Structures are given as C-alpha cells and as structure tokens.
Design a protein with these regions (language model features):
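A generic structural signal for ordered alpha-helices
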Residues: 1-9, 49, 60, 64, ...
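A glycine-rich, hydrophobic loop/mini-helix early in the fold
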Residues: 30-96
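Generic hydrophobic, helix-prone segments enriched in Leu/Val/Ile
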Residues: 27, 31, 64, 170-176
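N-terminal basic/disordered segments at the start of proteins
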Residues: 1-30
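Flexible, glycine/proline-enriched loop segments at strand-loop-helix junctions
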Residues: 10-14, 70-72, 154-161
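Conserved, well-ordered active-site substructure
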Residues: 198-202
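Internal, well-folded beta-alpha domain core
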Residues: 76, 80-195, 205-206
C-alpha cells in the first residue's frame, strides 16, 4: 500500500483501548439480551467510518477484528476499500468467500435468504466455529415486526428491523432446528446495535 493510499484510509477508534472496551461490553450485552437495543454512545459517534459503513458497524469491526479473524465484505463498490481499511487498523484477514469467514459484513440490501446457506454454521461438537452476520439496516426500533423468544428474553420481545425482506427472516426461521449449529446475527443502525444469537427464535408479527 503506497503513501497516498494510506492517507486516504479513514481513521480508527478515537481512543482505541477505552472505546473498544466500551463497544465490547455493549456487544456482550446485546448478545445476552437478544433484540434489546444497545447504544454505542461516544465510541460509535467518535468513529469516522469509511464510505460504505455506518458508525456502529465500523466500531464493532474495529473492536472484534484481529489477525486471527477472517472477515468477508459483501461485493460492492466499497468492498475493496473497506477490506484495506480493516486490514490496516486491525490486521484482520479478508476471506475470499462467505463460507470461509468468521464474520460477514452486509448491508440491508445484501441480506438475502441465500446468505444463511453461505455462512458457516459450525458443528454439533464445535458450534462456536459458526459465523456471525453483521448487517447494517435502515432502522431499528422496539416495535412490532419480529417477535423474539428464547434464552435471555423474558416471555417475548418485539424488534422492528427496517430494510430487510421477509424472506430473509423466513429462511432464518427454517434453520432454527439446526441449533446448536447456526449463524449469529448482529444488526446495526447509526450508533445502535441489536443481536439475535442462534438460540433466539423468531416469529413474524403482523
């Protein structure tokens, strides 16, 4: 990478240690309380994300990525630049295909039903080797849309996800019987994140 290319890269976290700790705690909270909105507060706001990524998506990637992590960006106009940005700041490896990746980074438009079959789902003996889908959506709110049940949810919880088609969720539903195999899902919008671990069951609300 030449000097001019380096100058074009967007910066990382403003305070790498403090901000990464904050983002990681919020991410753990999101995974342990499925569907509950978590705000990344200053950590996301202080990220100047590259073109093609929102603040929360960038903050999560800068927090979880390291040289052992394989990340796949959905093909698009910004994919190559995003890969260079993430490699520069974290040393993460860029996967050549979705099935090779530990984390798949998608826009709402990229969240098609076939993504579920392209992501690694782990094995019964090693479910932790499954992938995580990181999807940047158009809106997130605690409103009717998806009804969530399962571990970490008392009774049920509603989450409305903007920009993701019904077929994506129907395919996710059809794979729930594979548990403990299955991909986890992290949703972002602006500074907000919400998570749907593979243990969470979903139903479409009217």
């Amino acid at each position: 990478m030449n000097t001019s290319s380096l100058a074009d890269l967007a910066p990382g976290l403003a305070d790498p240690v403090h901000d990464a700790q904050q983002v990681f705690r919020r991410l753990l909270d999101a995974m342990s309380r499925p569907g509950r909105l978590q705000s990344l507060d200053d950590a996301a706001v202080r990220v100047d994300p590259p073109a093609g990524l929102g603040a929360a998506t960038a903050a999560v990637l800068l927090t979880i990525a390291d040289p052992d992590l394989r990340v796949w960006f959905a093909p698009g106009a910004h994919a190559e630049a995003l890969a260079a940005w993430l490699r520069f700041h974290t040393g993460a490896r860029i996967a050549g295909s979705a099935i090779e990746a530990d984390w798949l980074v998608l826009s709402a438009q990229d969240a098609r039903p076939d993504v579920w079959s392209e992501a690694a789902i782990g094995t019964d003996e090693a479910p932790h080797t499954a992938a995580t889908l990181l999807v940047e959506v158009l809106s997130l709110s605690a409103a009717p849309g998806l009804q969530l049940t399962g571990p970490g949810i008392e009774h049920h919880h509603s989450l409305d996800v903007g920009g993701v088609g019904t077929a994506f969720w129907q395919e996710r539903q059809s794979r729930e019987h594979h548990f403990p195999r299955g991909a986890d899902l992290v949703l972002t919008c602006g500074p907000l994140i919400a998570a749907l671990p593979r243990s969470t069951r979903i139903a479409l609300e009217d």
